[in-house]
Amino acid sequence: MRRPKTGSLLLGSSTLLAVIPTPPDHSSAAVIEEIPGLIKLHRNGHVVRLPAMPEVPSTYSPEPGVVSGDVTINPSAGLWARIYVPRYPGRHPLPVLLYFHGGGFCVGSPAWRCYHNFLSRLAGTAACVVVSASYRLAPEHRLPAAYEDGVAALAWLRQQAGRAGADPGGWGWRARCDFGRVFVAGTLPRTLLL
């Protein structure tokens, strides 16, 4: 007997009762594109993002000499950044690294543990303030949305340089920054940065 390729298995107590074939789903909810283990795009436009990488709060500290916190860049677009600042006292402001996570513009977050751990260590080792900016992801937000968000993050950072008083987040990160030495890096394709 041939087994059906798709189906539903009905169990009663501990005995197999029947296998009822289920026809393939050609409705608007059918998956039309998939990055296995990461994202599914359904015909009706619904996007399912699978929990590929654990997210950690900014208070999670893999590097004891670094403090981190989240700030809002653009609330209407949902843009935010995670900022890492070395704790050691210094008389001189630190250079700033604006970092964009990888993921092909489809997946990723500054809150992913892999990026959080790496950037926390980088801030401590390189003695710099790291600003890890979020950006809107495809397919919900097609390119050039991610590019525009990168430009918005850089513009936001420039605005921070000209502001006095308490900084977003209220924990003093802005006073530690040398806004005359800002660098951009990431695990994105280099074409984003050109």
Predicted features and spans:
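Conserved alpha/beta-hydrolase "nucleophile elbow" surrounding the catalytic nucleophile
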Residues: 182-191
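Catalytic nucleophile-loop/oxyanion-hole region of alpha/beta-hydrolase
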Residues: 109-118, 126, 131-179
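N-terminal targeting or regulatory segments adjacent to alpha/beta-hydrolase or S9 domains
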Residues: 1-62
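Core residues of folded domains in eukaryotic genome-function proteins
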Residues: 35-37, 43, 67-69, 77-79, ...
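Short glycine-enriched nucleophile-adjacent loop
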Residues: 158, 191-194
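Short, surface-exposed "cap/lid" segments of acyl-processing enzymes
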Residues: 85-122
